[in-house]
UniProtKB/Swiss-Prot annotation:
Disulfides per UniProt: none
Residue ranges occupied by any S1 motif domain in the UniProt entry: 561-643
Function: Involved in mRNA degradation. Hydrolyzes single-stranded polyribonucleotides processively in the 3' to 5' direction.
Coiled coil residues, start to end: none
HAMAP family (UniProt xref): RNase_II
GO molecular function: exoribonuclease II activity; RNA binding
Catalytic activity reported: Exonucleolytic cleavage in the 3'- to 5'-direction to yield nucleoside 5'-phosphates
The protein's name in its UniProt record: Exoribonuclease 2
Key words, A-Z: Cytoplasm, Exonuclease, Hydrolase, Nuclease, RNA-binding
Length: 644
């Protein structure tokens, strides 16, 4: 009788529209209940029975109930699920399988089955890729997933690498394909095989993509030729190899091994500038005046060279610092090293005075055993030989940026606009509280940015520098020439790593068009989007593998008195993040470890400080001693405690 009653339908509609609702993101806790976070200020309690309908991270719309002045949320509609494709560990046997997502806040096993055509008998402990197929808020009875890919077995020593690559959907091995012969590009190659070119790399490097030759000129000036490996002499634009490189965009460097952008035959052999092998190169000849200025007679040309020596960073640095046993194999090579050190000195001074020089941070290298076990982690400081190569590459990239800008008006540029204009006033106000006066408009110009950076570098600590980092914009890849505030340069376009960066291959093709006097096509903006996304994923993958290896390495230090010096890198409401100085591991110090009485403790991300009883006890960039309290292998997190 009430079936089609329009009044009843209207009443229902009215009740529905009058019931308060909120949209937000579900935050799970370890205690079964959760919260619907609407924004930074507002959240609603989700009781345990209602949490069974949702998952941490789901974006939902919920009905808000008020009882006895307590509000709670009842999930009603799924806006965007947190999990779609994910990796996890399989539980159970073939007929009754479940998968536990590999995520710190997702503990529940999700029932699942293997997808059709996936020929693997899954067993307890296997790692797999899965895709969500059912969700309670979509009208399904429960969560359900489908296993779409087997990754590896639970006890595989190389789980950190295979799981991380599968999680981010990145390639596990080098691309297939061979390049049998060089293309006829219509380029005249200058024969420079008689010159004493050298490469300087790590001892284990196989993909050498830059060689250097220096010459003293009569008037105190120096000439530098930077010769770069020439993969575009083998790989035609639009070919199968080119398309594969375009998708990968970069060689993926993970602790212990890399997954190259090009087939290894090219990256480690045919294109690699090996000692005593004749190789085609794209080269840049530049003249440096006595103060390190790059003069206007920049020349790009195609050539063939034969590297005369594969030098190693540490050996070259030792020799220049008059330590160690290593000697250059001939006076000619020794002379090259001396001249390159002079160039480095001049360019370093020029950049210090006219641009910006990054503070030296050590690189951390994992030393791994046969089974992927971490034998040691060593900090490798950036020494004179590293700086020789760095200064030569930066100079060469400045040259390419100028030539592409002036001759074509486009290229693949690294652009960094400094501070976000929306933040300029807040930035000026913050600096003022620390006694630095800047003009909010001037600081948005390249000169103003450089001036501020030099003032910050002159501060006794890096504290203020760390406070303003959040006001900076991100570096971008652009086809349009633009400034790079971070380097303090008007334009910057890389072409010195074409074996491992697709953008550098594009710039090679554009520079070759300039050399031949041909017209060139502007690269499509989509390629910069792909490159930026791949760069992001590769960085996350490197961090994920690193976290896993750090957890393995420090596991036996948990609960011991072993002390580590640690730099505070971030402060949040829940505690502090620190970086261990000796090995680069990131650890978390929970707030209760800082001070037992919560009411007397203020952890401020805004100010970058921890106050105890109103006094600043810790601030970002402080270095403190810590011990390792706990290592949680399932979440790869390291919990530290300050030494009292």
């Amino acid at each position: 009788m009430f079936q089609d009653n329009p009044l009843l339908a209207q009443l229902k509609q009215q009740l529905h529209s009058q019931t308060p609702r909120a949209e937000g993101v579900v935050k799970a806790t370890e205690k079964g209940f959760g919260f619907l976070e609407v924004d930074a200020q507002k959240s609603y309690f989700i009781p345990p029975p209602q949490m069974k309908k949702v998952m941490h991270g789901d974006r939902i719309i919920a009905v808000i109930h008020s009882e006895k002045e307590r509000e709670s949320a009842e999930p009603e509609e799924l806006v965007e699920p947190f999990l779609t494709r994910f990796v996890g560990k399989v539980q159970g046997k073939n007929d009754r399988l479940a998968i536990v997502p590999d995520h710190p806040l997702l503990k529940d096993a999700i029932p699942c089955r293997a997808a059709r055509g996936l020929n693997h008998e899954f067993k307890e402990g296997d790692w797999a890729v899965a895709e969500m197929r059912r969700h309670p808020l979509k009208g399904d009875r429960s969560f359900y997933a489908e296993l779409t890919q087997y990754i590896t077995f639970g006890d595989d020593h190389f789980v950190p690498w295979w799981v991380t690559l599968a999680r981010h959907n990145l390639e596990k091995e080098a691309p297939d394909g061979v390049a049998t012969e060089m293309l006829d590009e219509g380029l005249v190659r200058e024969d420079l095989t008689a010159l004493d070119f050298v490469t300087i790399d790590s001892a284990s490097t196989e993909d050498m993509d830059d060689a250097l030759f220096a010459k003293a000129l009569p008037d105190g000036k120096l000439q530098l030729i930077v010769a770069i490996a020439d993969p575009t002499a083998w790989i035609a634009e639009g070919s199968k190899l080119d398309k594969a490189a375009k998708i990968r965009a970069f060689t993926n460097y993970l602790p212990g091994f890399n997954i190259p952008m090009l087939p290894r035959e090219l990256s480690d052999d045919l294109c690699s500038l090996r000692a005593n092998e004749v190789r085609p190169v794209l080269a840049c000849r530049m003249t440096l005046s006595t103060d390190g200025t790059i003069e206007d007679n920049i020349e790009f040309f195609a050539a063939t060279i034969e590297s005369k020596a594969k030098l190693v960073y540490d050996q070259v640095s030792d020799w220049l610092e008059n330590t160690g046993d290593w000697q250059p194999e001939s006076e000619a090579i020794a002379e090259q090293v001396r001249l390159l050190a002079q160039i480095c000195q001049r360019r370093g001074e020029w950049r210090h005075n006219h641009a910006l020089v990054f503070k030296d941070r050590p690189d951390y290298r994992f030393i791994l055993g046969e089974k992927g076990e971490v034998l040691d982690i060593v900090a490798e400081p950036r020494r004179i030989a590293n700086r020789i190569v760095e200064e030569a590459m930066i100079a060469a990239n400045i040259c390419a940026a100028r030539v592409l800008r002036d001759k074509l008006g486009f290229g693949i540029y690294n652009v960094h606009m400094g501070f976000d204009p929306a933040n300029a006033d807040a930035l000026a106000a913050l600096l003022k509280t620390h006694g630095l006066h800047v003009d909010a408009e001037e600081v948005l110009t390249l000169d103003g940015f450089c001036k501020l950076r030099r003032e910050l570098d002159a501060q006794p600590t890096g504290f203020l520098d760390s406070r303003i980092r959040r006001f900076q914009s991100f570096a971008e890849i652009s086809t349009e020439p633009g400034p790079h505030f971070g380097l303090g340069l008007e334009a910057y376009a890389t072409w010195t790593s074409p074996i491992r960066k697709y953008g550098d291959m594009i710039n090679h093709r554009l520079l070759k068009a300039v050399i031949k006097g041909e017209t060139a096509t502007r690269p499509q903006d989509e390629i910069t989007v792909q490159m930026a996304e791949r760069r992001r994923l590769n960085r996350i993958a490197e961090r994920d593998v690193g976290d896993w290896l750090y957890a393995r390495f420090l596991k036996d230090k948990a609960g011991t008195d072993t002390r580590f010096a640690a730099e505070i890198v971030d402060i949040s409401r829940g505690g502090m993040r620190v970086r261990l100085v000796d090995n680069g591991a990131i650890a978390f110090i929970p707030a209760p470890f800082l001070h037992a009485v919560r009411d007397e403790l203020v952890c401020s991300q805004e100010n970058g400080t921890v106050q105890i009883k109103g006094e600043t006890a810790y601030k970002v960039t402080d270095v403190i001693d810590v011990t390792i309290a706990e290592v949680r292998m399932e979440t790869r997190s390291i919990i530290a405690r300050p030494v009292a």
